[in-house]
Amino acid sequence: MTLDQEKKILIVGLGLIGGSYAAALSAKGMEVGAVDPDPDAIAFAEKNGFIRHGRTEPDADYVGRFDLIVFALYPHILLEWLDKYGPWLREGAVATDVTGVKSGVVEKAQALLCPRVEFIGAHPMAGREVSSVENARADLFEGANYIVTPTPANTEETIECCEALGRLLGARSISRLTPKEHDEMIGFLSQLTHCIAVALMTCKESRHLVDYTGDSFRDLTRIAKINENMWTELFLWNREELLSQMDLFIAHFGKLRDALAQGDEETMKGMM
């Protein structure tokens, strides 16, 4: 499928990311609709021009109109949605997601939809420390990295359609990784860094530390303010890979600690 101005796009889930997708695509002149159980989210998105129309409940007539469907949902909710409403999607449509884990999710989604609808995983590497559609921004993905995670079940045409979506959003760099490669990369670059930030914030009573904090602590802990429900689910979906990355970090942190304990200046300088 070629992604052009004639194509209709459905966003399922109007939070920060789904709302920002809607805002960015509407700003490019695309017809965007949405499904979200929160009537206030639908009303806000309509009022601010993020979407042309929306529903709080999916129905076959509505969801069957769209050529491209973007799921901005937690992994387990995405799979539940596809299991229940997937047959309503138009034959020949393309479906994609924004979830931060791919192994298991992509394969299960494809099994629920194929061959009528082709599902391809994608992950925009952008976000904010706040949630909800009220904080959505049309420029959220400008200059961001955008990862597409095709499998052998995907055609080249669909892969290129998903990459075109990334370009419409304003992504600077678009990459292709397998779901496994994605989860290994994301376990280190994103999930591990969030774990470190959370650990820093919880290892010491911090009520009065704000009076003495400098840039280094603020920079390291900025991402500690996270959606605990979403990130817990993402960590558990990627548990084995994240544990491997945590063990790697602990080993290198231990090496630095040992060098400090032994007064080993050369090792410390080398690591720095």
Tell where the protein language model's regions lie, with residue ranges.
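Rossmann-like NAD(P)(H) cofactor-binding subdomain of soluble oxidoreductases
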Residues: D83-E134
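Rossmann-like NAD(P)-binding element
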Residues: D59-L89, A93-T96
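Interdomain hinge/lid region at the active-site interface
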Residues: H208-M272
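Conserved short alpha-helix immediately C-terminal to the canonical SAM/SAH-binding motif I
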Residues: D40-A41, I77, K102-V105
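NAD(P)+-binding Rossmann beta1-loop-alpha1 motif at the extreme N-terminus of oxidoreductases
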Residues: M1-V63
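Internal alpha-helical scaffold of NAD(P)-dependent oxidoreductase catalytic cores
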Residues: A138-I223
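Phosphate-coordination loops involved in phosphoryl transfer and adenosine-cofactor binding
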Residues: Q5-K8, G92, G143
